[in-house]
Amino acid sequence: MDKEAKYVYIPDQEGNDVKFEVIIYFEIEKLKGQYIIATPAFEETDEAYAFKIFKDEDGSDIFIALEDDDEEFEMVLETYETLMNEDGLIEE
């Protein structure tokens, strides 16, 4: 994935591509994973979603939404909050 990408298209449950605005991209070495936090580009919402990035056999990015009740999600959330705090973008 282009780490500077502002938008990505992620298929919904019906297979329709939905445009998401990338809030932040980061890697977590401990999990050996790449992640984005993104929000739907054309919706007025305060909700953001965490996605893990995989590659398919053609090398294209596949974005898998993380469930908010697992350990990986918790680590991603902690990393996101730390990065945003370091950048001064959120306050505790």
Swiss-Prot record:
InterPro entries in the cross-refs: UPF0473
Source organism superkingdom: Bacteria
UniProt signal peptide: none
Sequence similarity: Belongs to the UPF0473 family.
Name used for this protein in its record: UPF0473 protein Cbei_1107
Organism listed in the record: Clostridium beijerinckii (strain ATCC 51743 / NCIMB 8052)
Organism taxonomic ancestry: Bacteria, Bacillati, Bacillota, Clostridia, Eubacteriales
